[in-house]
Amino acid sequence: MKILEVNCGSSSLKYQLIDMEDEKVLAKGLVERIGIDGSILTHKVNGEKHVVSEPIKDHRVAVKLVLEALVDKQHGVIKDMSEISAVGHRVVHGGEQYSDAVIIDDKVMESLKDCSKLAPLHNPPNIIGINACKAIMPNTPMVAVFDTAFHHTMPKYAYIYPLPYELYERYGIRKYGFHGTSHRFVSEEAARLMGKDISELKIITCHLGNGASICAVDRGKSIDTNMGFTPLAGLAMGTRCGDIDPAIIPFLTNEIGMSIDEISNIMNNKSGILGMSGISSDFRDVEEIASFKHDRRAQLALDVFYYRVKSFIGSYVAVLDGVDAIVFTAGVGENSSIGRAEICSGLTYLGITIDEEKNNIRGKATEITTANSKTKVFVIPTNEELVIARDTKFLVQKKISHKSK
């Protein structure tokens, strides 16, 4: 069974074709600048790159180009589209309705549109991608896999905000959490590396990238996470502020005369590492300037980031009543050995001892603590695409088995 995994942004489309017999990636690629000048498809097979530069006016054209690349005589990996058994779509927000992946039908599409008000930047492009695939592959099953689904196991006291309860009942204002597919994958991988069943373990997963969140995983289930109603909450991120005093918003409105749109733009696009450093949202740039140029604001931005991560880890140790393992993943979590060392240096009360040599290993799942470390620390490259493909395969096979009965 071959599964096409698709992740649509407002002007981009990432994809992987995975053979589920051995979970091998046959091809992967990225369509950029959809509907914008300079559109480009980068298609990769066995490390070789094939680039198509031509106008791509919308996502339907992008999907068509991807499928043409997959069946191309020179760069393709399948004979025709019938070899694609199903398409798995990443969908950011499933609201309260979806606690698991689901086969997409008309009812599901209506629900996804309803959820768009909760994720106006993310769900609409996801829906556009689904519609584009359905138009070109009308007989191929489509599956939605939700970023929010893993966090459906949070207890109510963890996700309810201390606001009038009617706001939750009428408008769904509550903590939802995001990056769930990533937190799920790396927590399961950590259990595998430890040689233990995940049902025996308490794990804190740190998805640290341009967007960042931390999750408390108790015996395989998310019981708390620090992103909230939107992905703006929690840690300081690349351009997002994370948790701040909500009274700052009316202050900026009343004292400075900023509009809500202006404030939203500042909090989402001009804050975080970029806002504090005044240099870049890219952690690598800020680390380099802090290290080699001794830039104080760059160092301050890093210190705030490290502090917030340590603070949430400490909070989740309390929530879990102990911890067996901490996992770092995503761009910063996987690649910043300095960042991991700084964060873990404040966690000595957990009996963590970092092995400096192991901490410098990149590109593979690795334990970076010494043999006598009481709490294990892992660096695990995330693989959300594989989780989406696995969930898609499971649902399609389940549907086939029901039909055969």
Curated annotation (Swiss-Prot):
GO cellular component terms, A-Z: cytoplasm
Residues involved in ATP binding: 14, 207-211, 282-284, 331-335
Keyword Oxidoreductase: no
Biological process per Gene Ontology, one example term: acetate metabolic process
Residues binding substrate: 90
Annotated catalysed reactions: acetate + ATP = acetyl phosphate + ADP
Top-rank EC class of the record's enzyme: transferase
Superkingdom of this protein's organism: Bacteria
Site-annotated residues for Transition state stabilizer: 179, 240
Residues at the catalytic site: 147 (proton donor/acceptor)
Gene Ontology MF, one: magnesium ion binding
Subcellular location: Cytoplasm
Principal localisation: cytoplasm
Biochemical pathway: Metabolic intermediate biosynthesis; acetyl-CoA biosynthesis; acetyl-CoA from acetate: step 1/2
Pfam families: Acetate_kinase
The entry's keywords: ATP-binding, Cytoplasm, Kinase, Magnesium, Metal-binding, Nucleotide-binding, Transferase
Cofactor(s) this protein cannot do without: Mg(2+); Mn(2+)
CDD domains, per database record: ASKHA_NBD_AcK_PK
Gene3D superfamilies documented for this protein: 3.30.420.40
Protein family (similarity comment): Belongs to the acetokinase family.
Protein task: Catalyzes the formation of acetyl phosphate from acetate and ATP. Can also catalyze the reverse reaction.
Assembly: Homodimer.
Protein name, UniProt field: Acetate kinase
Taxonomic lineage from the root: Bacteria, Bacillati, Bacillota, Clostridia, Eubacteriales
Gene: ackA
